[in-house]
């Protein structure tokens, strides 16, 4: 007995055994393969095997593999947040600290230079973010000698349509976003940082999930934030700010972004890495 060779053509009227219509393939010699698999002997289709006894299945569960960790904390000191907000808004008027506020090249926002951690008036912010960064490094079994910030900058959004393209932070281990001021515009996307799945191939097939739809099976996640919310994450995790069409009601969106590195050793059995 040999496997038949023949051309297949699409037959939209094909039937499956329970009588429900379903697309299938029909060969030129007249029979339909409902299973979608070319598997027949001597031009005869192979019928699905009948299961005569019910197979009992227990302990069904859904696990999450390869998570991207997001470290979250919050500052509730209103005086501190108000002071940082005032200092950043003051810096927007200084052309030596970043882009000029209201610049026609970017009328929706302002960005400081990435040396904010070197300015005396931001040392308390630097020290706070450095302490939080050290806590994240301590979560891992690194041989840390010192944690330090390589860069730190402020982002200010004034008006609707402000956004920030999806991006990563190369040449860094951990990055963070400190939400100093959050506009009350009634939508999470305008307030927070949106994170994207770093695995493009995972979105090649993306069925609708009607049950249990949450961060673990979504392509993007926009966590709810408040004034003082701090996120830290691996620098390779794509993130950005989605465009908002609503008025900020006079409250600018102010965040401080930063990158954290270490001196010491990330040790594995086969490939230790030394940072100096």
Question: What does each model-identified segment do?
Answer:
Residues 212-276:
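Catalytic core of Fe(II)/2-oxoglutarate
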Residues 71, 150-152, 174-176, 254-258:
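Hydrophobic residues positioned within well-ordered beta-strands of beta-sheet architectures
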Residues 39-142, 161-163:
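Non-heme Fe(II)/2-oxoglutarate
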Residues 149, 188-190, 251-255:
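Short edge beta-strand segments in beta-sheet-rich domains
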Residues 120-150, 158-173, 180-188, 273:
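Active-site region of the double-stranded beta-helix
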Residues 154-232, 266-269:
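Catalytic core of non-heme Fe(II) oxygenases with the double-stranded beta-helix
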Residues 78, 183, 200, 237-239, ...:
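Short, solvent-exposed loop/turn segments at secondary-structure junctions
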């Amino acid at each position: 007995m040999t496997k038949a060779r023949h051309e297949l053509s699409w037959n939209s009227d094909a039937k499956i055994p329970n009588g429900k219509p379903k697309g299938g393939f029909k060969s030129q010699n007249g029979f339909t393969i409902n299973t979608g698999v070319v598997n027949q002997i001597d031009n005869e289709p192979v019928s699905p095997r009948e299961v005569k006894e019910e197979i009992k299945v227990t302990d069904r569960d859904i696990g999450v593999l390869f998570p991207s960790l997001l470290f979250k904390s919050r500052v509730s000191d209103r005086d501190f947040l108000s002071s940082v907000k005032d200092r950043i808004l003051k810096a927007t008027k200084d052309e030596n600290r970043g882009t000029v506020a209201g610049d026609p090249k970017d009328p929706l926002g302002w960005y400081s230079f990435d040396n904010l951690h070197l300015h005396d008036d931001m040392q308390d912010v630097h020290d706070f973010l450095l302490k939080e960064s050290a806590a994240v490094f301590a979560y891992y079994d690194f041989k840390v000698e010192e944690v330090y910030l390589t860069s730190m900058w402020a982002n200010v959004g004034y008006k609707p349509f402000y956004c920030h393209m999806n991006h990563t932070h190369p040449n860094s281990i951990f990055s963070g976003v400190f939400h100093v001021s959050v506009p009350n515009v009634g939508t999470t996307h305008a307030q927070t940082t949106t994170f994207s799945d770093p695995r493009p191939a995972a979105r090649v097939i993306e069925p609708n999930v009607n049950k249990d739809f949450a961060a673990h099976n979504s392509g993007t996640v926009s966590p709810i934030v408040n004034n003082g919310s701090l996120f830290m994450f691996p620098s390779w995790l794509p993130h950005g700010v989605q465009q908002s069409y609503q008025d900020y009601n006079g409250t600018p969106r102010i965040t401080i972004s930063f990158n954290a590195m270490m001196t010491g050793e990330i040790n594995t059995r086969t490939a230790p890495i030394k940072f100096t």
